Structures are given as structure tokens and as C-alpha cells.
């Protein structure tokens, strides 16, 4: 299975989510940033992943499941802040959270 790294920028009323692929000790961007809840990040990411033939169906499902978990968690809280850091890192170990105030 390919290794992916999520980047989540936590803004005031939304999150921006992008996906990178881990290549040895470096990462390469797979997607641009998708904003939630401003747009349907899940649907946009799904369409983009479908257009990349090198991403297998099992990897696409894996990635979309993580995105679903991120979106659902954010929807419950309506925000992420630095006080959430320990729980977020435990729940989402492959996600890099960036806080912007």
C-alpha cells in the first residue's frame, strides 16, 4: 500500500485539506487544498483520485475513509485548536495539523 500524508490547515470556521504521497524521505503533492465545509471536499477528492490511474482502488478507499473521519470529527467540534493537538495526533497519526489564527 502506498504511504500518504495528510496536511490539514485549521482556519477559523473551516479546514483546508491536502494529500501528499510519501516517497522515501520526501513527500510529493497529490492534491491541491480542499476546503471543508466551504465545498464538498470528499467528492472533489474522490474525483481527483479517480483521475490518477497510479492510485489503486484500495488506496483510494483508504484515503477517502480517512478524509471521512477527519470531516466527521471536525463537524462534531466545528473547529480544531492547539488544545486538541494530543487527541488529534493520537486519532490521526498520518496527519500534519497546521494552526492559523
Curated annotation (Swiss-Prot):
It comes from the Eukaryota. PANTHER family: 30S RIBOSOMAL PROTEIN 3, CHLOROPLASTIC, OS04G0461100 PROTEIN. The keyword Chloroplast applies. GO terms for biological process: translation. InterPro entries: PSRP-3/Ycf65_sf, Ribosomal_PSRP3/Ycf65. Gene3D superfamilies: 3.30.390.140. Belongs to the chloroplast-specific ribosomal protein cS23 family. One of its GO terms (cellular component) is ribosome. Probably a ribosomal protein or a ribosome-associated protein. This is Small ribosomal subunit protein cS23. The lineage of its organism: Eukaryota, Discoba, Euglenozoa, Euglenida, Spirocuta. Keywords: Chloroplast, Plastid, Ribonucleoprotein, Ribosomal protein. Part of the 30S ribosomal subunit. It is found in: Plastid, Chloroplast. Pfam families: PSRP-3_Ycf65 (PF04839). GO terms for molecular function: structural constituent of ribosome. The keyword Cytoplasm does not apply.
Amino acid at each position: 500500500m502506498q504511504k500518504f500524508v495528510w496536511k490539514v490547515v485549521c482556519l477559523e470556521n473551516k479546514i483546508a485539506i491536502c494529500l501528499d504521497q510519501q516517497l522515501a524521505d520526501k513527500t510529493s503533492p497529490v492534491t491541491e487544498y480542499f476546503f471543508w465545509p466551504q465545498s464538498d471536499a470528499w467528492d472533489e477528492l474522490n474525483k481527483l483520485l479517480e483521475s490518477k490511474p497510479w492510485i489503486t482502488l484500495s488506496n483510494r478507499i483508504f484515503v477517502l475513509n480517512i478524509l471521512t473521519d477527519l470531516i466527521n470529527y471536525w463537524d462534531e467540534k466545528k473547529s480544531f485548536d492547539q488544545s486538541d493537538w494530543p487527541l488529534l495526533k493520537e486519532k490521526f497519526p498520518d496527519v500534519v495539523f497546521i494552526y492559523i489564527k
